[in-house]
Amino acid sequence: MGRELQKAKNKSSIPKKRQKGPSKKKILQNPIIAKHWNQKETLSQNYRRLGLTSRLNHATGGQEKTIALLGLNDPKSSRADIAAGSTANALNIVSKAPQTIDVEELEVERDPETGAILRVIGQKEETANPLNDPLNELDDDEADEWDGFAMVPEHGEQEQVNPVIRELEEAAKNGERKAPRKQSQREEEWLERLVARYGDDYGRMARDRKLNPMQQTEADIKKRVKKWQASQASQA
């Protein structure tokens, strides 16, 4: 049994903070992107699936690591044989060992007493040999060739183009061009007053505080006047 006199709960003056839900980006500008947009995915996930990017600069962190991004399932990738949970260093250098060894005949000069190789005869290019190793010329430099970073996936030449990218390219190629901006009637009247008073002296137009209250620069006024004069000539 509870107490007879319950203490009234004082209302706190601190407002409750409610966490906002994830914002859903509505794509209203481009109908092709809006048609393939998935509201259940984030902006980065949608852009990655559509083959787009929200920024042209290199990612500096916070990028979601996926198997497809690391190229683990790509047989042509240098990391195809590494497990998905591997924590290999991103700067590991992968070198391809030669599968077959080319047989080559060389003429060598031996010591008549010990039979040791003194030098290789007929070698076109002399390689560095600081330790005076007589077999230094037989080393194959192909095994030491740098093949890039391990984390960078390699793509083939016949990579399939994303259908969304193909639609966007066709729309950009065959789409209507944006009409140039037309000057309003008030802008034309303002330019007409400037030209009537100063002619082609754009420096005095820019310094006039009454006729140029928005402090447009000399170059901007000149560009507007040239455009206004061209429109007047076409209408005549």
UniProtKB/Swiss-Prot annotation:
GO terms for cellular component: nucleolus; ribonucleoprotein complex. Transmembrane segments: none annotated. One of its GO terms (biological process) is rRNA processing. Pfam families: Nop16. Its main location: nucleus. Belongs to the NOP16 family. Component of the pre-66S ribosomal particle. This is Nucleolar protein 16.
